[in-house]
C-alpha cells in the first residue's frame, strides 16, 4: 500500500529517488514549507505486470528527508496520520496544549517550524539549543514540539502551541 523512503528526494547530485518515482509514477507534492522537513515528497508508483491482481494499480509513495530530525518530524506529523487514515482511523487531529515559552526566538522564518522543546518544572517550555536537522540528540532530549507559525517570533512568556511527543507516539 505504501513505499516509504528516507533521503534521496532533494536536489543534490546523489538524490536519485525523486527521478525514479517520476519515471515509475508521479509526484503530487514535492518540497513543503516546513522546517525541519522541506525535502518531502508524495506521489504514486504504478505496480508492474508481475504484481498479479494488483498489476497496474497505483501504490502510494512517500519520500522523507534524509536528515535524521527532518525524517523523524515529518514521519510523526505527516506519515503517521496518513497511515492511520489508511487503516481507517477517523480521529487523527493532533491535540495541542498552550504553554508559556521560557525562551526567545528573535528570528522569523519563512517556513512553519517545529521546534524541539521540553516542559520544565515551572510549567513552561525550554528550547533545545541547537535546532539543526542533523542533531538527533534534540529528539531524545525533547518531550514535545512547538508548532511555530511562519513569519513569527517568540518572546519569553509568549504562549505557544505545544505538541507532546507522547501524543504522536500513541
Residue ranges of predicted features:
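Short glycine-rich anion-binding loops that position phosphate/pyrophosphate groups of nucleotides
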Residues: 8-14, 66
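Short acidic/histidine-rich motifs immediately flanking catalytic phosphotransfer sites
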Residues: 1
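Short Gly/Thr/Asp-enriched flexible loops that form oxyanion-binding sites at enzyme active sites
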Residues: 12-24
Amino acid at each position: 500500500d505504501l513505499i516509504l523512503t528516507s533521503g534521496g528526494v532533494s536536489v543534490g547530485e546523489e538524490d536519485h529517488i525523486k527521478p525514479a518515482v517520476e519515471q515509475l509514477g508521479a509526484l503530487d507534492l514535492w518540497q513543503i514549507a516546513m522546517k525541519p522537513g522541506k525535502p518531502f515528497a508524495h506521489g504514486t508508483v504504478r505496480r508492474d505486470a508481475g504484481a498479479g491482481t494488483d498489476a497496474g494499480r497505483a501504490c502510494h509513495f512517500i519520500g522523507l528527508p534524509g536528515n535524521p530530525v527532518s525524517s523523524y518530524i515529518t514521519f510523526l506529523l505527516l506519515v503517521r496520520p496518513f497511515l492511520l487514515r489508511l487503516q481507517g482511523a477517523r480521529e487523527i487531529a493532533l491535540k495541542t496544549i498552550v504553554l508559556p515559552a521560557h525562551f526567545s526566538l528573535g528570528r522569523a522564518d519563512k517556513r512553519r517550524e517545529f521546534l524541539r522543546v521540553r516542559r520544565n518544572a515551572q510549567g513552561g517550555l525550554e528550547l533545545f539549543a541547537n535546532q539543526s536537522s542533523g542533531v538527533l540528540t534534540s529528539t531524545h532530549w525533547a518531550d514535545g514540539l512547538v508548532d511555530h507559525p511562519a513569519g513569527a517570533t517568540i518572546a519569553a512568556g509568549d504562549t505557544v502551541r505545544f505538541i507532546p511527543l507522547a501524543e504522536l507516539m500513541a
